[in-house]
Amino acid sequence: MRSLVNGAIESDVFELTKAVVRRDVRAAAPLLEHLLAEGNVPQQLLALLLWQFRVLLFASRDPKMAEAERMAKAIRSSSGAIMRYTQFARGLAQSDIARAYESLYACDISIKTGRADSEEAALLLCVMDLCGVPGADYRDFLLREAPRR
């Protein structure tokens, strides 16, 4: 996947992830808007966010370099990426990361099943949920019946 995504997009999504981890919706929403305005596909951005939360999951264990190298092989990343994410993962509990996975998964399913009116709106709502905005929990939409088209 890394070869399909240019470095600028990854860098911007990293900034988006940092804003989400800080629960800073005022920074996260404009970053997402910029990424979408640049023509990035919501599914691609969702995949990158998921990948970054996977790295955060491993980084949250505060690994030493040897352990980070083993972890990196398991997720096809680099030990450097895991070590860089360690500082951002310090304030996150495993439950926070699990909750983020649930939100990202709900967004993905809502897009793929047609429950989302627009992919962009679904992704924005997901980012807002990840930032802790009340009422933005996209998992609730999975409990509803799919719209008839």
Locations of regions flagged by a protein language model:
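Small-residue-rich helix-loop
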Residues: 1-99, 134-135
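Amphipathic alpha-helical interaction/assembly segments
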Residues: 37-59, 96-149
